[in-house]
Design a protein with these regions (language model features):
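Hydrophobic membrane-insertion alpha-helices, especially the h-region
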Residues: 22-43
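Short acidic-hydrophobic surface loop/beta-edge motif
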Residues: 59-65, 162, 190-192
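Surface-exposed amphipathic alpha-helical segments
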Residues: 195-227
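Extracytoplasmic/periplasmic/luminal assembly and interaction segments
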Residues: 68-119
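N-terminal Lys/Arg-rich, disordered targeting/topogenic segments
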Residues: 1-19
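Non-cytosolic head/periplasmic domains of membrane-anchored proteins
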Residues: 103-191
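A mature extracytoplasmic/lumenal domain signature
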Residues: 76, 177-179, 203-205
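Ser/Thr/Pro/Gly-rich low-complexity linker/stalk segments immediately outside membranes or between
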Residues: 42-61
Length: 227
C-alpha cells in the first residue's frame, strides 16, 4: 500500500476514534445531567408535598373519624396514646392561634367527635340554655356578645352563656368561673364541621374578645388536615 494511502487511513481512523470518544463523553454528560435534574425535581416535589401546617421532617398520621381521613401532625395531638394510625372514636388536639388580647397566641383544645355524639352550642342555646337563664344580664363581656348566667339549681353553678343575639346562626360559648384563685375562666363551644364530624373547643375566656375571628381561624386551621 502506498505510504500516502496508509497515512490517510491512519488519519481517518484517528478522526473516527476522536468522534466516538466525543459522542461517549456527550452521552455521559447528558446522563449525569438527567440524574441531577431528577434529584432536583424530586426534592422540589417533596417540598411541594409538605403541608404548610407542619415542618418538612414532621411525621403526620392518618386517623379516620366521622367518615373522614385526616392527616394530623404528631405535634397536634394532645395525648401521646392517640399518636397511632387508624380509626378513632375521638381525637384530642391542641392548637395555638392568635386569638388572645391584641392577637397574642393562645392554646385552643380541640376534641373531634362523630357528629351524632354532640349538639352544637347554637342548638343548645334555644333548646337548653334559654330555659335555664337567670333574669340578670351581664354586660361586662366582649362587644357584640350578651352574657346570661345559668341557674345554679340545675347544676350550672358559676356558668354563663355568651352569645351573639343578632345572628340566625349565633356564636355561642358557655364559660365557667375560675375554680381557684389565680385560675382563668374557661369556655366551651361545640360546632358541626360538616357531615359526620363535630368539634368541641375549650379555651380561656380572654379569647372571647376575638369571637368574630374564632370560627374562621379554626376552620382554616382544621382545613389543613382534611376537614
Amino acid at each position: 500500500m502506498p505510504p500516502t494511502h496508509v497515512a490517510q487511513t491512519t488519519q481517518k481512523a484517528g478522526q473516527d476514534s476522536s468522534i466516538g470518544f466525543n459522542l461517549i463523553a456527550i452521552a455521559l454528560l447528558v446522563a449525569l445531567g438527567g440524574i441531577g435534574l431528577a434529584y432536583a425535581l424530586d426534592a422540589a416535589s417533596r417540598g411541594a408535598r409538605t403541608p404548610p401546617h407542619r415542618a418538612v421532617d414532621e411525621v403526620a398520621l392518618t386517623r379516620t373519624i366521622g367518615g373522614k381521613d385526616l392527616e394530623i401532625p404528631l405535634s397536634w395531638f394532645r395525648y401521646a396514646e392517640q399518636r397511632v394510625e387508624g380509626f378513632a372514636r375521638q381525637i384530642d388536639l391542641q392548637l395555638t392561634l392568635p386569638l388572645g388580647i391584641s392577637g397574642t397566641p393562645r392554646p385552643i383544645e380541640v376534641t373531634l367527635l362523630p357528629r351524632s355524639r354532640v349538639r352544637p352550642s347554637s342548638s343548645l342555646l334555644d333548646g337548653v340554655y334559654l330555659h335555664q337563664f337567670q333574669d340578670e344580664e351581664r354586660n361586662d363581656g366582649p362587644a357584640g356578645l350578651i352574657g346570661k348566667p345559668l341557674a345554679s339549681a340545675e347544676g350550672f353553678q358559676g356558668e354563663t352563656v355568651w352569645f351573639d343575639p343578632l345572628s340566625v346562626d349565633p356564636f355561642v360559648a358557655k364559660c365557667v368561673a375560675p375554680v381557684a384563685d389565680g385560675a382563668e375562666s374557661r369556655c366551651l363551644r361545640t360546632v358541626y364541621l360538616g357531615p359526620g364530624l363535630a368539634a368541641v373547643y375549650a379555651f380561656g375566656a380572654d379569647v372571647l374578645g376575638n369571637w368574630k375571628l374564632f370560627d374562621p381561624q379554626m376552620r382554616a386551621m382544621l382545613a389543613k388536615i382534611g376537614i
